[in-house]
């Protein structure tokens, strides 16, 4: 099945979202799958929790990285919503935290950051 048909549009950027209770390893596998064949102009945002631990993930396609979008910077800002921290590279970043109730706000922050960087 083509996962991209489930994408939403944020400020003209194709955006895949994973939200809810998911094992972080499943999210990481999804990122690698998307990275292997991601069309241009694509991001993946994940705000998940498992066993009381929230995790955020951002993947940014290479063309958007070349335009200045930086997953590492965005994840540090969004991680505040889950009382956590994280980092990574311009194309892929993850964060963990202590406040699983904050994943909804974290997703909203990530969406706003994508729109601001578009």
Predicted features by range, described:
Residues 13-118:
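Glycine-rich, acidic loop segments that terminate in or are immediately followed by a histidine
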């Amino acid at each position: 099945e083509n996962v991209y048909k489930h994408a939403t549009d944020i400020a003209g950027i194709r955006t895949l979202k994973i939200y809810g209770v998911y094992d972080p390893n499943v999210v990481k596998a999804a990122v690698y799958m998307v990275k292997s064949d991601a069309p241009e102009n694509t991001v993946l945002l994940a705000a998940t929790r498992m066993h009381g631990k929230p995790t955020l993930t951002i993947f940014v396609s290479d063309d958007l990285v070349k335009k200045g979008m930086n997953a590492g910077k965005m994840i540090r800002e969004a991680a505040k919503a889950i009382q956590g921290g994280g980092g990574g590279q311009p194309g892929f970043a993850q964060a963990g935290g202590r406040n699983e109730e904050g994943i909804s706000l974290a997703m909203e922050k990530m969406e706003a950051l994508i729109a601001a960087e578009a």
